């Protein structure tokens, strides 16, 4: 937060977090991109918006940038039934040894097969870590706990949001820039770090769990670390000249470029995954909540 204040962050609140949507320090980009950054002439359209955010997303698309994702809500599900519970809750396949060490983008459905949650699962050997948004995270945490209790799954569900923080790095030059700060640059090569994989790295002497996943339509990584290590990692990346980009680029403009949906805005329980254009090509064999209705929607000629 202190670094974002120094950069002249334009803050808005979400789920109790003050998030910088753009930075005054990047307003020189407005001159660089000129009329590629539109002017919103109507007050209602310009409210709670800063033009520099659109310039930042153009710069990220040409090079790379880092984004503060400290607002992520995270909780661990562990115990004898942790995989069984997540398999029941998630539309995507969670079980199987091949998924250990991967990040899995998935959804929770309700009994009508409609979307009630949109999140990422870290599949570890002994637990699953749910990485969620600041607004939907507390709701999904209590939902998982309630389902586990109601259905008798032998698990422990623990909020770890205040233990870990996240920095995103994305853009066509993300790999080469990230190589400058990790202790083992070769670990980032495509053959060593496939898409959706989780690998342990070291940056500025700090242990970092990196997930190769993109919410913004550009190559890159989520960097997860102990909360107290976040500032050192951020400073190491900034020391290499990597631009800080506001969360507007992550949450809106680049997300829309990738054709992803935003929970509680685009994604509501009145829509199924086919209507949202987020359904996977195949439906997993394992049973999951809402599967019967999901298959019914799949069989329709049109939604």
Regions found by a protein language model. Give the residues of each.
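Glycine/proline-enriched, intrinsically flexible loops and inter-domain linkers
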Residues: 1-303
């Amino acid at each position: 937060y202190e670094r974002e204040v120094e950069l002249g962050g334009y803050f808005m609140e979400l789920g109790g977090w003050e998030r910088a949507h753009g930075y005054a320090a990047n307003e020189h980009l407005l001159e660089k991109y000129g009329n590629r950054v539109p002017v919103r002439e109507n007050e209602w359209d310009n409210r709670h918006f800063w033009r520099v955010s659109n310039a930042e997303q153009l710069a990220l698309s040409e090079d790379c940038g880092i984004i503060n994702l400290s607002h992520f809500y995270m909780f661990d599900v562990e115990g004898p039934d942790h995989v069984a519970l997540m398999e029941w809750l998630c539309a995507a396949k969670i079980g199987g040894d091949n998924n250990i060490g991967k990040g899995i983008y998935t959804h929770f459905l309700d009994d009508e097969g409609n979307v009630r949650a949109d999140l990422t699962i870290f599949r570890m050997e002994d637990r699953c870590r749910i990485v969620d948004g600041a607004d939907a995270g507390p709701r999904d945490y209590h939902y998982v706990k309630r389902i586990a209790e109601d259905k008798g799954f032998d698990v422990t569900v623990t909020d770890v949001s205040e233990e870990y923080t996240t920095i995103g790095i994305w853009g066509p030059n993300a790999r080469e820039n990230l190589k400058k700060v990790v202790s083992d640059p070769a670990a980032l090569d495509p053959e060593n770090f496939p898409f959706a994989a989780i690998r342990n790295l070291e940056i500025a002497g700090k242990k970092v769990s990196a997930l190769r996943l993109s919410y913004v339509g550009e190559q890159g990584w989520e960097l997860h670390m102990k909360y107290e290590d976040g500032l050192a990692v951020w400073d190491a990346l900034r020391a290499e000249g990597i631009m800080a980009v506001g969360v507007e680029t992550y949450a809106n403009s680049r997300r829309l470029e990738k054709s992803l949906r935003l929970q509680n805005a685009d994604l509501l329980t009145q829509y199924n995954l086919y209507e949202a254009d987020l359904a996977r090509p195949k439906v997993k064999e394992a049973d999951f909540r809402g599967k019967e209705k999901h298959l019914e929607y799949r069989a329709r000629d049109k939604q």
